[in-house]
A protein has these predicted regions:
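C-terminal functional module detector
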Residues: 18-77, 81-84, 88-136, 168, ...
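Low-complexity, serine/threonine/proline-enriched polar segments
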Residues: 134-158
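A conserved hydrophobic secondary-structure block that centers on an alpha-helix together
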Residues: 166-170, 185-189, 201-211, 215-217, ...
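Hydrophobic, small-residue-rich alpha-helical packing segments that form membrane-like cores
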Residues: 209-215, 220-222, 226-228, 235-282
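Alpha-helix-centered segments that form part of catalytic cores
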Residues: 172-180
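The substrate-binding groove and active-site-proximal loops of carbohydrate-active enzymes
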Residues: 66-71, 160-173, 224-237, 329-339
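C-terminal motif of bacterial Sec signal peptides marking the signal peptidase cleavage site
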Residues: 14-16
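Sec-dependent signal peptide recognition
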Residues: 2-8
Length: 636
């Protein structure tokens, strides 16, 4: 945190974006209280029993988050929803942001509940909070005072110990109501869906380092319709299990909600640990409560991808993708075990077999975690996430510092080190896809509940995955393929109960027409004792039956222009059977779709800056999508 604040102060000074200037703006320009749109009594336009693919971002911050406002973010929840619907918004560094690929179908502001909306009031002349010595230090021109004041807020969020003088429940409650109102105001059933939501900001403090570095245990909490008058935060308790208790209580009072954990990759191995928050053994009650409240997990976002890690999946050639492993506000490396979803699936199956419960039956989603109200989903149009801290190519380390034209002699200072350790390693990711009957809160939330969701690293590729016992290759070209798939099996997120015979799987993917062509579709199989990756559909034809791999389709990138070379597929589909299926063994299956190679955002920025790409990050990537799994359950 100290490093980040020091860099912020320098960036603010360099950009002449003075975050210490008094805040005279209104928190919201639209202040009329809005009730949520009533549940539709008639189906909206576009309703489909076979379900439509809708895309959205479930993790967005505004000026009301303490770690956005300090970095000169001044945009509101209303601005966030306008951005998602296609309006151009100004970045804190002064340039325009317009969403790549056109308007999204759904969007959610998830400001940190801790000290929600407090910093803007501390920086508003004449308020009681502005008179506090802590406020005067935080918005002074003294870097040491700014850093110390903001660190104290971070320490409070991590410990759960309230700073009484700045904890004004009336302000926090008012801003929470404003965020709810903004979600209600911009919700248009059938066109654009929003949810009242917030972030629960739990962090495990790393005792080995004298800083605020720690493991990320954050959750975003979403309400299906109405939301309660207050949000449960780490200032109530940093223990996620206490959050689940509160959610159960709210559900009994009519407030249906789910929580979605994110960035398990930097949880220091704590997100999927094999014991409770307080170190007790896991049990059936824990598993049931976790799955009731956390049916999904955010698998990819700007701070990296949490599917798997090369050390956990050494035989997966595509495991080393956008790996980010630095603890929050630290250069220290997060522990790998306990931090990745595929390993959690394996451990969950083992617990099911040995203990009779599985607390890790998550569906998959993705988001940006943007703190500037709008996500950067396109590698060729990237603006990172924090604000003025990483608002330029130099600040995020994609071009050499201070006008140099090569990477040989970079200065040894905090800005350079932060760019190397953090910002250059971040990713232009991601988006959630859902299969829902219509674009409404009820339909999309129900898709969350049944885990008929998929995650992408930014492109809006559509992916379906089914399992059953009646699928055949003859179905693939039928006009009613989707209806047959639903009628003959279960979709992603479902359980397939054994019948004594081997199931068949149906995988289908369609490219985003504005992004790269498809290279392959894979099925990832996980059991309690191992894993395997099978190519099941290839641009080049059928996979090799011995290696289960597609042949090379020759796709590449022209590194002078970032233009793709070679061909790829617009659509890939296959009916597949597991060649090593064991009728008696539980297994988890999910689909991973890979695009052809494309330039990473850092390469795009280096090309525009007429400098060589940064040598310590990949020059190209393969954008991808991940479906929620299907769980095979042997017959009794």
């Amino acid at each position: 945190m100290k490093r980040l604040l020091g860099l912020a102060v320098s960036a603010i000074a360099l950009a002449a974006c003075d975050s210490t200037a008094p805040d005279t703006s209104m928190q919201e320009t639209d202040t009329a209280h809005m009730e949520p749109a009533s549940s539709a009594t008639e189906r909206t336009a576009g309703y489909s029993e076979d379900r439509n693919a809708y895309f959205g971002d479930l993790h967005i911050h505004t000026r009301s988050s303490f770690d956005a406002y300090i970095f000169n973010v001044r945009r509101t929840a209303n601005d966030a929803y306008r951005f998602a619907r296609g309006e151009t918004i100004t970045h804190p560094s002064g340039f325009d942001m317009t969403i790549a690929g056109g308007p999204l179908d759904f969007y959610t502001v998830t400001d940190h509940a801790e000290y929600l909306g407090i910093l803007p009031v501390m920086n508003t002349p004449g308020t009681e909070l502005s008179k506090l010595p802590r406020a005067q230090d935080m918005f002074s021109t003294d870097p040491e005072k700014i850093t110390a004041a903001f660190q104290s807020v971070g320490a409070s969020v991590r410990s759960g110990e309230v700073i009484e003088e700045m904890y004004d429940e009336s302000i926090i409650g008012s801003v929470w109501e404003q965020n709810i109102d903004a979600a209600n105001r911009h919700y248009v059933p059938g066109e654009f869906t929003t949810f009242a939501a917030y972030e629960f900001t739990s962090v495990t403090v790393n005792e080995e380092e004298d800083s605020f570095a720690g493991g990320n245990l954050h959750r975003n909490v979403f309400f299906k319709g109405d939301a309660p008058d207050r949000a449960f935060s780490t200032l109530d308790s940093p223990n996620p299990e206490d959050l689940w208790d509160w959610m159960d209580e709210q559900r009994s009072e009519g407030y249906e909600a789910i929580a979605i954990p994110h960035n398990s990759n930097v949880s220091d191995g704590q997100m999927f640990r094999l014991e409770t928050y307080n170190g007790d053994p896991l049990d059936v009650a824990y598993a049931e409560q976790r799955m009731r409240n956390e049916p999904l997990v955010e698998v990819t976002q700007v701070k990296g991808t949490s599917e798997t890690h090369p050390s956990l999946s050494p035989n997966d050639e595509w495991a080393n993708f956008e790996i980010y492993d630095r603890l929050l506000a630290s250069y220290q490396v997060s522990k790998t075990e306990g931090g990745y979803v595929r390993e959690a699936y394996r451990n969950g199956l083992k617990l099911q077999e040995e203990e009779g419960f599985d607390p890790f039956r998550f569906g998959l989603v993705a988001a940006s975690d943007s703190h500037v109200v709008g996500g950067a989903y396109d590698e060729s149009d990237y603006w990172s996430k924090v604000g003025v801290v990483d608002g330029t190519p130099m600040a995020r380390g994609s071009v050499p510092f201070f006008g140099k034209k090569n990477w040989d002699e970079q200065p040894d200072n905090q800005m350079v080190n932060n760019a190397r350790e953090w910002f250059s390693r971040w990713a232009a990711s991601g988006l959630t896809g859902v299969w829902a009957e219509e674009n409404t809160r009820e339909s999309i939330f129900d898709a969350f509940r049944r885990k008929e969701t998929f995650a992408t690293t930014g492109p809006r590729m559509k992916v379906r995955f089914f399992a059953g016992y009646q699928y055949s290759d003859d179905m693939l070209d039928d006009a009613d393929l989707t209806r047959q798939a639903y009628d003959g099996g279960v979709p992603m997120g479902g359980d397939l109960v054994g019948t004594g015979e081997a199931p068949t799987f149906l995988a289908w993917a369609q490219r985003d027409p504005n992004m790269g062509a498809l290279q392959r579709v894979q099925v990832v199989k996980v059991t309690s004792v191992g894993e395997a990756v099978y190519d099941v559909a290839c641009h080049t034809g059928s996979p090799d039956p011995a290696t289960h791999r597609c042949s090379d389709n020759g796709a590449a990138v022209d590194m002078e222009t970032c233009a793709p070379t070679g061909a790829g597929a617009n659509e890939l589909k296959a009916v597949w059977q597991d060649p090593e299926f064991d009728v008696a063994q539980r297994a988890t299956y999910y689909v991973r779709v890979l695009e052809n190679p494309s330039c990473r955002w850092s390469t795009w920025e280096a090309m525009r800056g007429n400098v060589p790409p940064r040598p310590d990050v990949p020059q190209t990537i393969q954008e991808r999508a991940y479906t929620s799994p299907i769980w095979y359950i042997p017959a009794d």
